[in-house]
Regions:
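Mobile, glycine-rich extracellular loop/lid and propeptide segments
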Residues: 50-352, 360-381, 400-428, 454-461, ...
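Inter-blade linker and blade-boundary elements of WD-repeat/beta-propeller domains
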Residues: 383-401, 439-447, 501-504
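Short, charged low-complexity linker/loop segments at the C-terminal edge of domains
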Residues: 435, 538-539
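A beta-strand-loop signature enriched in Asp, Gly, Thr, and Trp
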Residues: 426-460
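Secretory targeting and sorting signals
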Residues: 2-49
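Cytoplasmic membrane-interface segments at the C-terminal ends of transmembrane helices
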Residues: 11-15, 442-444, 489
Length: 539
């Protein structure tokens, strides 16, 4: 098995920097032939590094291939540990971002901070309105900034969505200068109005929550909406804001309905894009007959998309429209049993994991524990396989359900990692079966268990060099509220079916679905008890 070419990466000298924009990663991960893999894996190295979005890039691979200072030897060193902890106002559900030497962290009290990556000093802070009081178990005592923002390196701007309570609950899209925290001229933009496919059924901020991570694509910011912990009547939405004109567009997962659900939450995972005008989402449960797609081909989408993976296209006027979809053939049962497909965020596998017949793959997993391997160019519709089964590239499992999104490692032949709810960290090995089809097979699990809503994995490595990778994740703790959370680090390749935990570090009280950020030999984690914590070697 040949190896994946990583994105443009840092040189191996300590603290050297490289560019890792999400846009570059759309095309920067390609599989090398064996002969090429034996040579240099790293192209010319630009000047600096960033971690601009949830799971590092728009494919949502969560693979940071530019981390020679986070290798096994470095992490096992006696001086690797907590470097600093900075107190912030409010719980941190969003993954921190790294913009140059500044870590940007946002909280549920609508506070945003720029923090020095070196020593944890607060460089700037902003308050973006009063959070909305919430009595739900998901976000009590209030809802502010829940989703992971996105950083546009070209303009030095951080885009984020805040829910605030001035003159009633509403969502605002903010554009902040990453260097100072100042709001850009003409911002914020209020999310309001009717979806393009559901006129007369306006967006309702009162019953909506914005958890899915933001996507920056071709000069627009896109983000999804689901329910506030399943309370009230709601439908899913995808919104987009043009960063130049500030024009807003809305699309509903349930045309003509205000109550048939299909929320876009994905346990905080980000909307996926593999190129211009292509956006992938996963949706949650539907409410009643007709909320999930009926039997039919994916390229003839209808108007109802609960329990589905949907590929949206961006029209010339900036509006969104469904172009393809996949929904399991038992989607009505999933709806009934609260086993939504959209508890998992999708991840697009880098070019090279596929074959000539299926060159562009996507991984999707949900609450019922099945892992679907899909073709991004032909998602499969509903019931289009033999005898009305699923027309997918492959299915693995079922294992325990997943509330999270995958991590990908392109070395050692290729692996995908999942954290099971009340289960284990699971490694799935990529291969091609005897019929020439791509497949994922379970290769091993961790001996340690994970509680409800533990975070999603992140992989660091030095290119695709074998022995350089580690898998990082947040364990949700021993208590119902995230007490005694840990940052755990695992070797990426199972030995005799077991993934070895290399080290763990206490975090205090952590949030659901927490994802660490990595950059330049450091790991950054936000916590429920209001801290941003950095780990690395003493320097």
């Amino acid at each position: 098995m040949s190896r994946l070419h990583p994105p443009p990466a840092r040189a191996v000298r300590r603290r050297a920097r490289a560019s890792r924009s999400g846009t570059a990663l759309l095309s920067g991960l390609v599989l090398l032939a064996p002969a090429a893999a034996a040579g240099s894996l790293v192209s010319a190295i630009p000047a600096r590094a960033d971690n601009p979005t949830i799971s590092l890039n728009s494919l949502r691979t969560a693979w940071d291939a530019a981390e020679p200072d986070l290798g096994p030897a470095q992490v096992s060193a006696s001086d690797f540990g907590r470097r600093w902890s900075t107190a912030v106002d409010g719980a941190v559900f969003a993954q921190p971002l790294v913009a140059g030497s500044t870590v940007v962290v946002a909280t549920e009290t609508n506070h945003v901070y720029g923090v020095s990556a070196t020593d944890g000093r607060i460089l700037w802070q902003r308050a973006l309105g009063t959070p909305v009081p919430s009595s739900t178990a998901c976000l009590s005592p209030g809802t502010g900034i829940t989703s992971t923002p996105v950083y546009d390196k070209a303009t030095g701007t951080v885009y984020l969505v805040a829910k605030s309570n001035e003159n009633g609950a509403h969502f605002s899209v903010h554009a902040l200068d990453a260097a100072s925290g100042a709001e850009r001229s003409g911002w914020p933009v209020t999310v309001q109005g009717d979806p393009v496919n559901s006129p007369g059924v306006p967006f309702d901020p009162g019953t909506s929550a914005q958890r899915a991570g933001l996507l920056l694509l071709n000069g627009a910011v896109y983000f999804g909406f689901a329910s506030d912990c399943g309370v009230g009547t709601y439908v899913g939405h995808v919104a987009g804001v043009n960063t130049s004109t500030r024009k807003l567009t809305l699309w509903s997962t349930e045309s003509g309905s205000k109550s048939q659900n299909g929320g876009v939450w994905m346990s905080g995972g980000g909307l996926v894009s593999d190129g211009s005008g292509r956006i992938f989402i996963a949706t949650g449960n539907g409410a009643g007959e007709g909320s999930s797609p009926p039997k039919g081909p994916g390229d003839k989408p209808q108007g109802h998309f609960a329990d589905s993976v949907v590929r949206l296209g961006v029209n010339s006027d900036g509006s969104l429209a469904p172009k393809d979809f996949f929904s399991p053939s038992n989607n009505r049962q999933l709806d009934h049993d609260d086993l939504d497909l959209g508890s998992g965020g999708p991840a697009a596998l880098p070019t090279g994991f596929g074959t000539s017949a299926h060159p562009h793959l996507l991984v999707q997993v949900g609450k019922d524990g099945r892992i679907f391997l899909l073709d991004r160019d032909n998602l499969g519709g509903m019931g289009q396989g033999p005898n009305g089964t699923d027309a997918v590239v492959g299915t693995t499992g079922p294992y325990k359900g997943v509330w999270g999104h995958p991590g990908v490692w392109g070395g050692d032949g290729g692996y995908v990692y999942m954290i099971e709810n009340y289960g284990s960290l699971r490694a799935l090995k990529y291969s091609v079966n005897g019929s020439g089809n791509p497949q994922l097979t379970s290769a091993g699990t961790s001996a340690e268990g994970f509680g409800y809503a533990s975070g999603s994995p992140v992989v660091t490595s030095n290119g695709t060099t074998s022995g350089s990778a580690l898998v990082w994740l947040v364990y949700s703790g021993t208590g119902p509220g995230g007490q005694n959370g840990e940052l755990r680090v695992y070797d990426p390749v199972p030995v005799n079916g077991t993934l070895k935990m290399r080290r763990s570090f206490p975090l205090g009280t952590v949030t659901r679905f927490s994802v660490p950020a990595t950059d330049n030999g450091r790991v950054f984690v936000g916590t429920k008890d209001g801290h941003l914590i950095a780990f690395g070697r003493a320097s």
